[in-house]
């Protein structure tokens, strides 16, 4: 028993320096972050609607007896499913104290059976587009504002401490979601999640770029890490909707909180976040990176591709409740095809994109996103959403798995190979999509309708696609070109950082990979 314990401790000690274990930590952090991001998608619209109408339903029950005139009788007809009201000559009192004289008349009231899950033609439901959109956008807005600071922080103190801070904040946010019973507390929990997400995503992607220094090799681990994001998006909505309907609102968040604790324990042991590990060289200033047109094109692709699904998240469940009479569990399951296809897309094109050209992969992805989004309003039921949602997810997977590695490649090619700031920009682009998408999407859906909302974002994605052509062969800066000519190596980029890899170093079993 003691020998097995020693073997386990030795394995853990050796694994601490493994790139694969670091990849697993980033994968798990992105998985849980995006599960929390999407688990609220089917819960919040229905939960806010139920909170708002609990009071209204109580008031209706107390006022309903006043509407019945004592001299009236009702006869239900099974022939045509209608109710005939027969009233005699009498004077009754209507709500508000108004006097009303009834005569002997017959009023036929058609009985239409409307499911309780189908609040169509409800003005409150239409207005909820804006409220839900702002709630969803708050996380991305806070993350958008926090990312530049996290990028600079990682350059100064390294990646482990911000990574662990992201875990702590996400745990607090998850518990707040579980026990929040008002819109204000939900808004605070969602905003707090934005800070935690910023720490996890910027530090995580920067950490991967620093340990996988070869451009061709880097695509695969980043595709796997984005697979964690995809898994979170995949599992979140159905996981949340099923537990919400059959267990309650608190259940999905408590399960997530337990998983987040597990992630924190692994980070604490492997990354040792108490140690400050600054970068060995000074990175390119954030303002300089923001002036690079090639970085801006890559960031724009990430932003507009993800803006499509971000607009769908608050608007699609409400549109389904209004037009399809969808049940609670269906509101989350509708996103399942997009989530599955995103997972497929990131894993396939994480490897394939480098061979076919990342610019071409992103260009095709933007076009497919636009076409798929344009098809969504034509769906008449939940089955009609399968194909377009599958196309949306698959295409966004193409874009993300192409553009995330190319951000690191552009820094290697044109700037100093320090990755915190450039992945802060990538995450800012992602967050802009998720900040502008829900907030603007909710307002547009309320003003001109859901179909026009889909038309607008679909056209924007297709129009942006040709700009990806400029990423086909981005030029190197003069000093970088001199290095390339000296080493006579126009493709491999690993010489830029192979002497500056941080101390989550490569294990003995993997040193041969970097030779």
UniProtKB/Swiss-Prot annotation:
Segments crossing the lipid bilayer: 21-41, 131-151, 161-181, 191-211, 221-243, 250-272, 293-312, 330-353, 359-379, 391-411, 416-436, 442-463
Glycosylation: residue positions: 56, 80-81, 89, 111
Classification via InterPro entries: MFS (IPR011701), MFS_dom (IPR020846), MFS_trans_sf (IPR036259), MFS_Vesicular_Transporter (IPR050930), Multidrug-R (IPR004734)
Residues on Lumenal, vesicle side: 42-130, 182-190, 244-249, 313-329, 380-390, 437-441
Alphabetized UniProt keyword annotations: Cell projection, Cytoplasmic vesicle, Disulfide bond, Glycoprotein, Membrane, Neurotransmitter transport, Phosphoprotein, Synapse, Transmembrane, Transmembrane helix, Transport
One BP term from GO: histamine uptake
Tissues expressing this chain: Expressed in the substantia nigra and the tuberomammillary nucleus of the posterior hypothalamus. Expressed in stomach, in particular in varicose nerve fibers and enterochromaffin-like cells in the corpus region (at protein level).
Matches recorded under Gene3D superfamilies: MFS general substrate transporter like domains
Activity control summary: Strongly inhibited by reserpine and tetrabenazine. Also inhibited to a lesser extent by ketanserin and fenfluramine. Reserpine and ketanserin inhibit by blocking the substrate-binding pocket. Tetrabenazine traps SLC18A2/VMAT2 in an occluded conformation and its inhibition is specific to SLC18A2/VMAT2 but not SLC18A1/VMAT1.
Annotated localization: Cytoplasmic vesicle, Secretory vesicle, Synaptic vesicle membrane; Cytoplasmic vesicle, Secretory vesicle membrane; Cell projection, Axon; Cell projection, Dendrite
Effect of residue 481 to A: Does not alter sorting to large dense granules
Function summary: Electrogenic antiporter that exchanges one cationic monoamine with two intravesicular protons across the membrane of secretory and synaptic vesicles. Uses the electrochemical proton gradient established by the V-type proton-pump ATPase to accumulate high concentrations of monoamines inside the vesicles prior to their release via exocytosis. Transports a variety of catecholamines such as dopamine, adrenaline and noradrenaline, histamine, and indolamines such as serotonin. Regulates the transvesicular monoaminergic gradient that determines the quantal size.
PANTHER family reported in the protein's UniProt record: GH10249P, SYNAPTIC VESICULAR AMINE TRANSPORTER
Similarity field: Belongs to the major facilitator superfamily. Vesicular transporter family.
The name this protein goes by in its record: Synaptic vesicular amine transporter
Designated gene of the protein: Slc18a2
